[in-house]
Regions:
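Short, solvent-exposed loop/beta-turn-alpha elements that line the ligand-binding surface or hinge
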Residues: 26-39, 83-89, 113, 119-120, ...
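Extracytoplasmic/periplasmic solute-binding protein
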Residues: 47-67, 92-149
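Glycine-centered hinge/linker elements that transmit conformational signals in sensory
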Residues: 95-102, 143-177, 217, 222
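Conserved C-terminal helix/tail region of periplasmic/extracytoplasmic solute-binding proteins
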Residues: 296-361
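A ligand-binding cleft/hinge motif common to bilobed small-molecule-binding domains
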Residues: 11-19, 196-213
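Extracytoplasmic/periplasmic substrate-recognition and gating elements
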Residues: 158, 169-170, 207-282
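Hinge/lid segment of periplasmic solute-binding proteins
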Residues: 2-66, 214-223
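Alpha-to-beta junction loops
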Residues: 1-10, 186-195
Length: 361
């Protein structure tokens, strides 16, 4: 039997918990080194929970993060201020552009002070911490043999703080709906960073009160901390095989090989909005060939995310934290600690502004 867990975050957390009960089969005995070498290295490495060489989790479809922009409302701002999409390549660049957008929108109503609009939001704060730190050369959760060491650096954490909490408090960033794509739809932000697998949910219209208008979009890479390495988050789906007799475990491994072969896997990801797991499948040529041969209709937003990531694939490293006890809870602390504080403090500040204080006060 196959244990399957598809997640936009961490399927390895669930698989690790089952493996701790000694219930997962070691898949490495059913794959040759040559076979495993065809898969994206970091995807395979995620399945090695210990230093014993046993492979417990096999990748079947992955995702990472991208930035999507409301092109329709971006263009007037960009033209008026000389801002370019290239400025969004770094986390610090996004902060600078967000400030510029806030000030530009504030200027549209000179008789109303401090009413500028937020530019940006992000779906996953844990990814912001984990990937931001890794881009700057540190692992916030350093894991070895299932044991985690919390590895913080005050200067690096300060950089993350300065590029989320500070702009959030100043009104440059926002997080109002359940997801940031919701905030784009309501016109509360112009751009956000989120999972490639969620691209299909980027809205086709903005709805503000009784007003609604269609929007186009821009897809670009997720930002890198200034001066940091081009590292992106690795998340998505994997399969693990529960322990059984050799015949059933072998049959499960044959299925995994079939399901992840180039053509089959690309057909699946085109319909699920995930990324393929073989190195050779992560190319625009391979994608286009499978789409044409099988007459597949792919959502245009999903296709644009695929091509954006595939064009940069060979220059990108993917990263996810190793599995450890309570790793899911640890990620949730990162997800909510800074975000909740920023929201609570911002609400308090907005109330003070409503009572007559200026934003700077």
């Amino acid at each position: 039997p196959i244990f399957m867990n598809i997640s936009k975050e961490r399927c390895s957390d669930t698989a690790y918990a089952v493996q701790q009960q000694d219930k997962l089969a070691d898949l490495s005995v059913y794959f040759t080194e040559d076979e495993l070498s065809r898969y994206v290295d970091s995807y395979i490495q995620e399945g090695y929970f210990n230093q014993d060489g046993a492979l417990y989790l096999f990748p079947v479809a992955k995702s990472t993060e991208i930035t999507m922009i409301n092109k329709t409302d971006w263009e007037p701002f960009a033209e008026a201020t000389g801002t370019t999409v290239d400025e969004l390549a770094t986390t610090e660049g996004i902060t600078e552009v967000a400030q510029r957008y806030y000030e530009w929108t504030d200027e549209q109503t000179p008789d109303v002070p401090d009413d500028g609009k937020a530019f940006y939001g992000r779906d996953s704060m844990s990814n912001y911490f984990i990937i931001g730190m890794k881009q700057m050369g540190k692992e916030i959760f350093q894991v070895k043999d299932g044991k985690m060491t919390l590895n913080t650096d005050e200067d690096l954490i300060r950089r993350l703080w300065d590029n989320y909490y500070v702009p959030y408090m100043k009104g440059y960033f926002a997080s109002l709906g359940k997801f940031r794509s919701d905030d784009v739809k309501t016109g509360d932000i112009l751009a956000y960073t989120g999972s490639t697998s969620s691209a299909v949910y980027f809205p086709d219209t903005v709805e503000i009160g009784n007003k609604s208008y269609p929007i186009d979009y821009i897809v670009c890479d997720s930002p890198v901390m200034e001066g940091g390495e081009n590292i992106k988050v690795q998340q998505g789906a994997g399969m693990a095989v529960t322990k059984s007799d050799e015949e059933h475990e072998y049959a499960a491994s044959v299925f995994l090989k079939w399901f992840t072969q180039k053509n089959q896997n690309l057909r699946f990801v085109c319909e699920s909005s995930y990324m393929p797991v073989l190195k050779e499948a992560n190319s625009v040529d391979a994608l286009d060939s499978v789409i044409k041969e099988n007459n597949i209709e792919v959502n245009q937003k999903v296709y644009d995310c695929f091509t954006t990531e595939m064009e940069d694939f060979d220059k990108t490293s993917f990263y996810t934290i190793g599995a450890f006890d309570n790793s899911y809870s640890a990620r949730k602390i990162l997800d909510y600690s800074l975000a909740d504080k920023a929201k609570a403090d911002k609400d308090a500040m907005d109330a003070a502004i409503a009572d007559g204080e200026s934003r700077e006060e």
